[in-house]
Amino acid sequence: MGLAVTQNGLARATSSLSLNRSIMLMAQDVYREPDDTIIVGNDTDGYTFALERGGELVLGSNSVTEVLPDDSDDTAPDSQVQKPSVIALEGETIVLQSDSRVTVTGGDISIEASTNPRLQGSFGGLGDPDASPAEVIVESGAIIDASGDDTTVVSVARNYVQVEARGNELADSPLQRDGAIRDETLVVDIREGTEFLNIEGAVASIERDVHERLSPGGTITIQSVGRVSIEEGATLDISGGSVTYSGDQVAPSQLVTADGQVLDMADADPNLVYSGVFGDFAFDHEKWGITETFLPALSYYEAGYIEGRDAGILEINAPGIVFEGNLIADTTAGIHQRMAPEDLAAGQFNALTRSYN
């Protein structure tokens, strides 16, 4: 922190499952002046210390400022919240020179230009852009990147969870609580789901590494009490990342109804009577004097595929905005997502200004 800050090198941090990281570059000045009223800080001999001047922050050409996921193989369930990592740039004038790069994988990038750091909450789009010298300039060739991670590779078999059909799992299927399926271990495809039993606990226990947890696109927020200028050739990237599923052998469960139908778990009606789980059991038809034998369930090879993640958000808030750069908000629609495109969110671009050029 200082009234003039220049970053010409490499500033890097890494995110983990348990810790998000931040890089904060602030061009601000701490000074004192006589004042009988304490605004912030401690009163020392009639003076008040406060951050009241924004300065000049420059990210030099070819500089790199980045927060990346670490290379750990550690995993955690979705119940463990993954806080986004942050890069914050603050000053009165903020310049990202040509070929500079700011990157937070699937995280938040905040750029705020203000003459007075104490009044940062006053950003608004209805003022006069010429009334303040505050400005954010992103030069041609500069890159601001909050895109999601696309390096995760897991087995397609992870989509199949084992669930024991017991009290909690059959809470919404009263007909099955004392039926032939109770206490059986069932394998369910979480992409298709099932109404037969509750699989939420099994799904919540699926563990993911930090790369997968950072695969959705992040957020880029640029605010100024004066102007924001994104020059032609500058790039802002909020693309969604992806997860690659490798092919594997899978063996989802099937249920056999009392009249001999074999149903996939996605089609299993909890209001039907079942004889058992398809695979290596015999069912005696006493009325007809015959025994029907079901062979073990066969596994099969499921091919791999890519699953895209949501793109992120770009928000620009200033009285004067010139956006001539490139906005990238790509998403990858995998084979399963092409059948349900509403499950993949596109990027958002929100601009609040008096006049948009």
Go through each PLM region and give its residues:
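Extracellular and secretory-pathway beta-repeat/beta-biased strand scaffolds
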Residues: M1-N357
